[in-house]
C-alpha cells in the first residue's frame, strides 16, 4: 500500500474507488489512513470494494420476519430542482411485507435504458408517489464471527464516547439498518458532529450518491441559505435537518463542484468529515451504516455547527477527545482560545503517542476485568436456570409497564438479577424473550449494568444493584408498545462479539431451530442478526461487550409522530462496583484523568437520521375559499368603523386611501418618515412589523440621522424576487448585493422614497445623488398600486403599463418580475380570478367595490384575506419562506394562538379564568394565589440536558445570592442521585404557578399555560369540553351571554374585543398619527 505516489493527493477532488487485498482489508483504521494518503478524503466520499472471499453474512434468506418498527413515508414538495423532504411515520411492518410493497407496481423501479435515464426520471418524478423508507433500524446483519470491517465493531477513537463518557448513541456508535425502495432518498447533509460514516450495501438494487468536496462545502451552504431563507433564519445549521434536496442541474448552474457514483451490492461507501452528500435508492435493497472517527476528525468536531432549534439532535462532548488526545491544547480549548483552522487536504495520522498510551492502559485493565468476570460467573450455580429459561421458545410479547427512567428506583439483590439484560428506548430484552400479555415487568429486568471496555471493546458484566440514574431530562416520557405489532424473531439477541484474543475457549454449539421456511434442511441455519442459538452456552454471550440495541427484536413504537419526544427516549444503565484489587488497577490505569470505571454509567440514546416532519397543507399558488361570516366574527375592524374615536382614525387614513383625492405631498411624508425608521428601506419593511419601528422610536430620544448612502444588509432574500409565478430560475446569476451581503441605501430626489439599490434593482453606477425612482422618472404623480387600496411607497411599472408596489409583487405568489435583476417590468397576468374576488378584512367596508388582489394566511386552510399593504399596516406577521413558498403569512388570530407563552396575558389575583378540573372538563374559576419558580437549563458533558434544575442545585456558585451564572459557563451541580456533575449553563426560565378555586370550593394548582383568560380565544379542544355548570348553587354567578358565546361553533376572536385588534391598538394609532403630523418623524411606507 505504500508504493503509490502520495504527492498527487487527488487535486481534482473526484470520488476514488479502492480494491484492497485480504491482508490490506484486515486493519480498518490502517486502510482508512491509507486511502486518505491517496487523497480520497478530498472528494468527501470514497468507494471500497472488499475482497471476493470476504462475506459479512452467509445468506439473507432468513430475515423476512424482522420487524421494521417505524417506516417513514417521504413526501417531497418543491419545483425547478429545489425540494424539501418531509418524513411521516407509518405503521410497523416486516421485511417480507416491505419487500412485496417495494416490488409492487406502485413503488417498483420504472423501466429505464441506463443510469442517466433513471436519474432523469428520479428528479422529474420526485414529488409524485411518495415512497416508504425502512430507515433508522438499530441492529446489524453481520454474522458473529466476522472480524474485518464489522460495522458494529470498527474499533476507532469514536469508541471513547462509550468508554469514557458511558454514552451509546444508536446509529452513531452502533449500527443502523436501512431497507429502501425506488426513490427513497437521503437529503443533503454532513454527518452529525461532522464525523466519518461507513455504509455497506448488503443486497438489492444499487444506491446513487452525490458528494461535494469538503473544501467547497461552504459554497453549498451559502446557496442553500439563498434558496431556503425561512429555514436558515430559524436555524443556522438547518441542513442538519436532512430535508433539503438540490438537483445536480442547480449545482452546475451555480458552479458548485460535485461528483456522483453508484454503489452496488457488496460495496462500502465512506464519507469524510464535512463532506456533504445526498442520494437515492434504485429499488429494494438493504444497507447498514454507522459513524466512526480518526485523529483528523477531532479538529472538525470542535468547530462543527450545531442545530439550535431541536434539542434531540446528536451532540457529542469533545472534552474527552481534546483532554486525552490533545492534552497540550486542552486548557486553551476550555478557555475558547484554541483557534482551529481546518485543512481539508491533510490526511489523517494512524496513531499518536497519546492514543497509544490510552489504548495500552485500557487493554491492561480490560484483561483483568474479563478474568474476574469469568471466575465469578463460574461460581454461580443459578446460571443454569437462567440458561434453561433462555432456551425456551420466544412467545409473542404483549404490552408491559415501564418505570420512568428519570426517577431513582430500588434495586434487588445481585443474586436475583439475570445477566445480559439491556434496554433500548422503552424496550427490554425480556420483551423479546416473550413476556406474556399483561404480565408486569420485573424491576430487575429494566436496567443492565455495564463496565466500559479498555482499548476498543466493552465488556458485559454482572449487576450489584447499587446503580443510580444518570442526569437527564426529568420530564422524559416513555412509550408503551402496541400489542398488535408483527411477531418478532424466535431467538433472543446476543451482545456484540469481543476481541478474539480475550474470548474464553469456544464451546460446541447445538443446532438451533430453523428461522424460517427458507432455512436449509439437514443442518443449522446461519445465525440471523447476531442472535445466539438456543443451544449456545450462556457464558459465550455474557462476555460480549456492549448491549445490542434490540430494536430488531422488540415491538415497534406506535406513538405519535412527534420526533422530539421520540428522540429523547433513552435507557439508564447502572455501574458495577469493582473489588478492591480491580478498583485499584482501574484507578492506577486512569493516567489520563478519565472517569473511573467503577463509577461510569452507560446511557443509550436514540438518534434519527431521518427526522420526522410535517409537509405543508396546500401549494403556494392555492386560494382558499373565503368564509365571509367567519372573517367578520374574527375581525370587526373595517378601517374606519367600530373604533372609539372614528374621526381621529378617519383623519389618519383618509389621505392614503385610493377612494380619496391623490396627494403627492402626503406620500412624500410617508416616504420621508419611513426613511428614518428601521429598516430604512421601503421594501424591506415588508418583513419588519410596525410595532418594532414604534418601539425603536419610543426608546430613542434623539431623532436618527438620514441613512441615505450607507450600506446595510437587505431583509428581502434574493429568492423572493425570483420564485413567483412561472419563474424557473430560483436565483439570478448576479445581483446588486455586495460580497459582504450589503447594499447601499438610495433616496429618490422627488418623492423621498428610500430603498436598497438591490431591492429596487438599481445598478451600482446609478446609485448616486439625484437618483429618481421609476414612478418619478415617468412623472406619474398620481400613480397607485393595482393590487391594493393604499398609495405611496416603492412602485414599479407592470407589463400593462400600470403600477404596483414592489412589496405587493413579492407577496402575491402569481406575480413575477420579468427582469429579475432590475425588478421590472412586473407581470400580473397570472393572478387567478379567485384571488381578485377575495375581500380584504381590513378595508372591505371602507371601499364601495372590491378591488386589488388579496393574500391569505399561510396557516393550514385559513381563509383570512387581506391586501399586502393593509396587512402590513395592521401588523400581520410576514416572513421569508422556503422555496417555492416566497412569503409566510400569519394572521393575527393564528399569531396569537401559536405564540405560546410569549404572548400570554398577565393573570392577577381575583381574576376569573378558565382551566381544567380533575374530571377533565373546563370550568370558570377564580385565581386565589400565585407564585413563581425559577429553573435553570444546563447541558451535561455527555450531551444530555436538564431544563428544570433548581438554582440551589448548583454548588460552584451561590445562585440564590448572586443570580444565574453567565451563559456558557461551566458549573458544578449536585444531581438527584447525590453525585456531583459538571455542566454548562444555558439559560434561566421562570414558571408561574397559580392556585385557583372552582365554584364548588375545590382548589387546584396549575401552570400559566393551562389557564385561559376570558379575553383569549379558546382552542377547539377547550371549547368542546367547556362546562357551564358544576352542579352547585353558585352557577348563576358565572353564567351569561359571554359564556354561551364560548359554546358557539366559532368563537369571536380576541382581536375583536381587546387592544390586540389592529384598529384599536394604541401603538398602531399613535404610529399612524405620527405619519401625518410632522415631516421627518418615523412613518409607515407603502
UniProtKB/Swiss-Prot annotation:
Residues 512-522 have a biased composition (Low complexity). It catalyses: N(6),N(6),N(6)-trimethyl-L-lysyl(9)-[histone H3] + 2 2-oxoglutarate + 2 O2 = N(6)-methyl-L-lysyl(9)-[histone H3] + 2 formaldehyde + 2 succinate + 2 CO2. It is an enzyme of class 1 (oxidoreductase). Residues 585-597, 1026-1037 have a biased composition (Polar residues). One of its GO terms (biological process) is brain development. It comes from the Eukaryota. 2-oxoglutarate binds at residues 133, 199, 207, 242. InterPro entries: EPHD, JmjC_dom, JmjN, KDM4-like_Tudor, Tudor, Tudor_KDM4B_rpt1, Znf_FYVE_PHD, Znf_PHD. SUPFAM superfamilies: Clavaminate synthase-like, FYVE/PHD zinc finger, Tudor/PWWP/MBT. Residues 379-395, 456-467 have a biased composition (Basic and acidic residues). A zinc finger (PHD-type) spans 719-777, 838-895. Residues 146-309 form the JmjC domain. Binds 1 Fe(2+) ion per subunit. Residues 401-410, 468-480 have a biased composition (Basic residues). Keywords: Acetylation, Chromatin regulator, Dioxygenase, Iron, Metal-binding, Nucleus, Oxidoreductase, Repeat, Transcription, Transcription regulation, Zinc, Zinc-finger. Residues 441-450 have a biased composition (Acidic residues). A zinc finger (C2HC pre-PHD-type) spans 782-815. Residues 379-536, 575-624, 1024-1043 are annotated as: Disordered. Its cofactor is Fe(2+). This is Lysine-specific demethylase 4B. It comes from Mus musculus (Mouse). The gene is Kdm4b.
